[in-house]
Amino acid sequence: MTKTQNVDPNEIKKFEDMASRWWDLEGEFKPLHQINPLRLDYVLSKADGLFGKKVLDVGCGGGILAESMAKEGAVVTGLDMGKEPLEVARLHALETGTKLTYIQSTIEDHAAENAQMYDVVTCMEMLEHVPDPLSVIRSCAALVKPGGHVFFSTLNRNIKSYLFAIVGAEKLLKIVPEGTHDHDKFIRPSELIKMIDQTDLCEQGITGLHYNPLSDTYKLGRNVDVNYIVHTQKF
């Protein structure tokens, strides 16, 4: 194992405390359920489908994205450091008859033993919750096969993202629990791409994720001011 784990105990506890409500479609994780079809479709389109491919979902939590990828025929491994979310994920997979594997580990430790193991790696809404996002990105690069795809999603750091993600989503609309995010840990696209460039991953595209509070819906678009997804490939 790595001597110093790239983990924030406060972040782990935050999601441990909410774990039992992970699959409540009207609970704290409602936004993840709402955006999941968009995330899944984006991954499917850029990775040319997932059927039969080995896929790693980093920071899988209760398994929302991991399960949906398994249902597309992927051989999925979900990775997380939260014990409670993983127990919820395993139980839900059992209840739905979805076949996939969940592992409690840091990505750094997993990468040390599984180099070039996966065709696709997803790391969604996770980088802003760890002390060293570059370490996570490097590990993702190590885990994916040459020619494979890695997807990162996170939040931009600017005034608009503070107003939307912190003031709006947490304080006013109560879409997510207050304290879920730390604006200082948000990552600008230029910063994320600079970190990606320090690996053998190549950025292939970037898209924004937009929330409409009037219709309570999300859509993908060009604007990356708040939430965004980056598609990379290993060459």
From Swiss-Prot:
> Which residues are S-adenosyl-L-methionine-binding?
R39, G59, D80, M124
Which GO molecular function entries does the Swiss-Prot or TrEMBL record give?
A: 2-polyprenyl-6-hydroxyphenol methylase activity; 3-demethylubiquinol 3-O-methyltransferase activity; polyprenyldihydroxybenzoate methyltransferase activity
Q: Which transformation does this protein catalyse, written as a reaction? A: a 3-demethylubiquinol + S-adenosyl-L-methionine = a ubiquinol + S-adenosyl-L-homocysteine + H(+); a 3-(all-trans-polyprenyl)benzene-1,2-diol + S-adenosyl-L-methionine = a 2-methoxy-6-(all-trans-polyprenyl)phenol + S-adenosyl-L-homocysteine + H(+)
Q: What is its EC number?
A: 2.1.1.222, 2.1.1.64
InterPro entries recorded for this chain?
A: SAM-dependent_MTases_sf, UbiG_MeTrfase
Segments spanning the bilayer are none
One Pfam family, short name please? Methyltransf_23
Which Cys residues form disulphide pairs? none
Q: Which UniProt keywords apply?
A: Methyltransferase, S-adenosyl-L-methionine, Transferase, Ubiquinone biosynthesis
Q: Does the keyword S-adenosyl-L-methionine apply?
A: yes
Q: In which pathway does it act?
A: Cofactor biosynthesis; ubiquinone biosynthesis
Q: Name one GO biological process term.
A: methylation
Task: Name the enzyme group at the top EC level.
Answer: transferase
Q: Which CDD domains does the record cross-reference, listed alphabetically?
A: AdoMet_MTases (cd02440)
Does the record's keyword annotation contain Transferase?
yes
> Which family does this protein fall into?
Belongs to the methyltransferase superfamily. UbiG/COQ3 family.
Say what the protein does. Answer: O-methyltransferase that catalyzes the 2 O-methylation steps in the ubiquinone biosynthetic pathway.
Matching HAMAP family: UbiG
Q: What is this protein called?
A: Ubiquinone biosynthesis O-methyltransferase
Q: Which organism is it from?
A: Vibrio vulnificus (strain YJ016)
Q: Which gene encodes it?
A: ubiG
